[in-house]
């Protein structure tokens, strides 16, 4: 168990690591040859130009201005200088609201920490509960004297913790309500002021029913011309182009290798590069690399054209789904937010994501299989969570010197050294846990993709939800259980049964030391490592040396990245959970969390301004999830405090805590009804106002050309591929774009005397058979 000395060693290691990362960043960012790594967002906006194009030879690569080294920390005030409205214009509402999560952490925990340290810490410190606990052989450390563990059973001092629990709850709820109100207003204002985008006029229609007499495209056109005659404008059916997309990706990879060997040959024309054609180039016949890849690209071009023809001619490649666009935002809002058919499983509509946000491969998944896929992933996630208890138990064994000596007695002579003991107990458990979790976000994202979500934002939200549940069960509850009940097992066996609940009550707060070490590793050094961008830095210079030939190549090599919401938001929620749980129990943990929120806010604000380039904009659609998880953490903290006090003989004060979860739950229901609709539905009033203003400003704007190809699959947007079929089936009038489309007659036949024979697959005439 970590002592105050162990915590001090861990703090020194992590602070030193964070300082090294920040100093390295401050120096590397001002070097001209790293400019594209640390300021890629400004290059993508066309505002910043490369310093390598001007100046003396040395100054093109190394910053020789000594004054800039004296101002190496000026990135900190610069990161805080940009006001929020300008930040929204610069990076989008998603990025600005994401930063507000860190601000909420500061708003909640700074006042709570001041209150806890001024009231709870003196109350805990002046008690003598741990001296009595030693008589029952319960292990503890110096840091536990600052926690609730140091209060004697049945003491009236527990009333202080009860009052503080109410104060913490009311303050947290107040901050959450104000933030929910603020973010909801920001979202509505953002949507109202947003520039014209295709997704504002478009809905995604899924589970289009099969018709034996009409193709999917004709069915969609007929349905919306009949049911939305005044607002329907155009549509684009969805294709299963996954095989074609795979070929296009393969061609792109092959082209990169061709570029690499051509560049290599231009630098040294005395030797033509050669490769082996076998597996990974390890064996096989040696051939000319350039000729080989030129031949491969020609072969892939032929395969791509064949696959395109197949998609064009094969009606089975058309999925029962379509992107349907309307003449007005009002029409799209009505369609997206209403039931289209008496059968609630058909003609399912939802707001279309941005075209750049669509996860095209999942649109090819049959809608009827989504339920089965999600059931499979629920089961897989259960087993993933369950079996991960094994590494969690291993991590907790590292937090105990006794456990290490028992499992690895040959290390006893090494770990008995005071310095090694401090490093092992204060630093090693946190870093090992972080290493175990490093691939988890990617695994959860793969699971979300398998479930069939069709937008990047929905994929990230589902992965974030699962990551949050995983952290709650394994990282938090798993660490507490394996770190308290298991390590006190010997004590349990030697005492009477009625003493066991008291021992558990004293032991639970002891795990605060482990979480403190984890916060320092992940929240201090980890955040400082985020701003250094070591991996993108290395890969940029490798690509710049081996592959880059043009400015476009150099731009693609920048890799600005983005906020990985599915990985970062659950991590933030873990800190909310730890802070709310331990605020009335072990307040000494709160300063470590506050440092995390402050440092993370500074770092991510800098990254959002200068580095990240978001793939999509959801207008803060994720905020209800953020709010709900903080509420969940608050309720969990209240329940755990009740359980803890019930083992401490606080029979008089504990029942008063029963009201807290009830109050919190009804507060959540109030916020859900008051603010959440702004994130789920688009008001028709605002849609009509925006349509009216736009028509007044641009009365002659032709919306059809703007929308008609907005949602064509990216593999059909190549410059060398134009196909009139997509004009023909996209559902817009091609005779004259200024004329209104008229209702086309349905191709369905009467079922009274005619058998239901499909005519959609007939390649010849589409007219009804003669009688």
From Swiss-Prot:
Bilayer-crossing regions: 7-27, 101-121, 158-178, 375-395, 427-447, 467-487, 512-532, 584-604, 630-650, 651-671
Cytoplasm found in the keyword field: no
UniProt region (Disordered), positions on chain: 744-771
Modified residues (Phosphoserine): 54
Tissue specificity: Preferentially expressed in guard cells.
InterPro entries documented for this protein: Csc1-like, CSC1/OSCA1-like_7TM, CSC1/OSCA1-like_cyt, Csc1/OSCA1-like_N
Pfam family, one: PHM7_cyt
GO molecular-function term, one example from the UniProt record: calcium channel activity
BP GO terms, sorted: pathogen-associated molecular pattern receptor signaling pathway; stomatal movement
Catalytic reaction(s) noted: Ca(2+)(in) = Ca(2+)(out)
Locations listed in the record: Cell membrane
Cellular component GO terms held in the UniProt record: plasma membrane
Protein function: Calcium-permeable channel that plays a key role in plant stomatal immunity. In response to pathogen-associated molecular pattern (PAMP) perception, phosphorylated and activated by BIK1, triggering rapid influx of calcium ions across the plasma membrane, leading to stomatal closure.
PANTHER family, sorted: BNAC05G09770D PROTEIN, PROBABLE MEMBRANE PROTEIN DUF221-RELATED
Record's protein name: Hyperosmolality-gated Ca2+ permeable channel 1.3
């Amino acid at each position: 168990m970590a002592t105050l000395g162990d915590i001090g060693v861990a703090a020194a290691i992590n602070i030193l690591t964070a300082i090294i990362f920040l100093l390295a960043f401050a120096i590397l960012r001002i070097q001209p040859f790293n400019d594209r790594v640390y300021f890629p967002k400004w290059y993508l906006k066309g505002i910043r130009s490369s310093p390598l194009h001007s100046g003396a030879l040395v100054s093109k690569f190394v910053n020789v201005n000594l004054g800039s080294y004296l101002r190496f920390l000026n990135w900190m005030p610069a990161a805080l200088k940009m006001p929020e409205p300008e930040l929204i214009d610069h990076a989008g509402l998603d990025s600005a609201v994401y930063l507000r999560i860190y601000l909420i952490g500061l708003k909640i925990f700074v006042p709570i920490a001041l209150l806890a340290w001024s009231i709870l810490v003196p109350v805990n410190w002046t008690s003598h509960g741990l001296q009595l606990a030693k008589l029952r052989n319960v292990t503890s450390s110096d840091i536990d004297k600052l926690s609730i563990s140091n209060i004697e059973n049945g003491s009236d001092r527990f009333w202080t913790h009860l009052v503080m629990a109410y104060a913490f709850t009311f303050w947290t709820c107040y901050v959450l309500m104000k933030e929910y109100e603020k973010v909801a207003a920001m979202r509505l204002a953002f949507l109202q002021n947003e520039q014209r985008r295709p997704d504002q006029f478009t809905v995604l229609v899924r589970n289009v029913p099969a018709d034996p007499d009409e193709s999917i495209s004709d069915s969609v056109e007929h349905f919306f011309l009949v049911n939305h005659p005044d607002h329907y404008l155009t549509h684009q059916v969805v294709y299963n182009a996954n095989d074609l997309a795979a070929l296009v990706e393969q061609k792109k990879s092959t082209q990169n290798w061709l570029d690499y060997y051509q560049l290599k040959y231009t630098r040294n024309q005395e030797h033509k590069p050669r490769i082996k054609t076998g597996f990974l180039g390890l064996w096989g016949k040696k051939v000319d690399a350039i000729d080989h890849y030129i031949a491969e690209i020609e072969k892939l071009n032929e395969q791509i054209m064949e696959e395109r023809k197949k998609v064009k001619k094969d009606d089975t490649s058309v999925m029962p789904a379509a992107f349907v666009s309307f003449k007005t935002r009002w029409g799209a809002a009505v369609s997206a937010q209403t039931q289209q058919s008496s059968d609630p499983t058909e003609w399912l509509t939802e707001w279309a994501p941005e075209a750049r946000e669509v996860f095209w491969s999942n649109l090819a998944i049959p809608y009827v299989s989504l339920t089965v896929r999600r059931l499979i992933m629920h089961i897989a996630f259960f087993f993933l969570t369950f079996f991960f208890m094994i590494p969690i138990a291993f991590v907790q064994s590292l937090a105990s010197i006794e456990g290490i000596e028992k499992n690895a007695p040959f290390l006893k002579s090494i770990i008995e050294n005071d310095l090694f003991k401090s490093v092992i107990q204060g630093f090693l458990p946190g870093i090992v846990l972080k290493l175990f979790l490093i691939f988890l976000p990617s695994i959860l994202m793969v699971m979300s993709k398998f479930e069939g979500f069709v937008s990047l934002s929905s994929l990230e939200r589902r992965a974030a939800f699962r990551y949050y549940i995983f952290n709650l069960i394994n990282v938090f509850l798993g660490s507490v259980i394996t770190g308290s009940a298991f390590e006190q097992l010997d004590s349990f066996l030697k005492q009477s049964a009625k003493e066991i609940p008291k021992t558990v009550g004293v032991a639970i707060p002891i795990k605060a030391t482990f979480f403190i070490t984890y916060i320092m590793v992940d929240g201090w050094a980890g955040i400082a490592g985020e701003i250094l961008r070591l991996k993108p830095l290395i890969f940029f210079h490798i690509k710049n040396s081996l592959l880059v030939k043009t400015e476009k190549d150099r731009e693609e090599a920048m890799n600005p990245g983005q906020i990985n919401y599915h990985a970062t938001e659950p991590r933030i929620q873990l800190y909310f959970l730890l802070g709310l749980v331990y605020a009335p129990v072990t307040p000494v943990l709160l300063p470590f969390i506050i440092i995390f929120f402050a440092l993370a806010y500074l770092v991510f604000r800098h990254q959002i301004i200068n580095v990240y380039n978001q793939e999509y904009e959801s207008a803060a659609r994720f905020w209800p999830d953020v709010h709900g998880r903080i509420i969940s953490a608050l309720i969990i903290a209240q329940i755990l405090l009740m359980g803890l006090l019930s083992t401490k003989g606080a029979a008089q004060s504990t029942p008063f805590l029963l009201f807290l979860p009830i109050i919190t739950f009804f507060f959540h229901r109030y916020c859900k009804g008051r603010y959440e609709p702004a994130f789920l539905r688009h008001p028709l009033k605002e849609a009509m106002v925006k349509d009216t203003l736009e028509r007044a400003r641009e009365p002659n704007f032709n919306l059809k050309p703007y929308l008609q190809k907005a949602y064509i699959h990216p593999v059909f947007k190549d410059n060398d591929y134009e196909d009139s079929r997509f004009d023909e089936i996209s559902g817009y009038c091609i005779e004259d774009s200024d004329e209104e489309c008229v209702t086309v007659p349905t191709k369905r036949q009467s079922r009274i005397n005619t058998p239901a024979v499909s005519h959609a697959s007939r390649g010849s005439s589409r007219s009804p058979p003669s009688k």
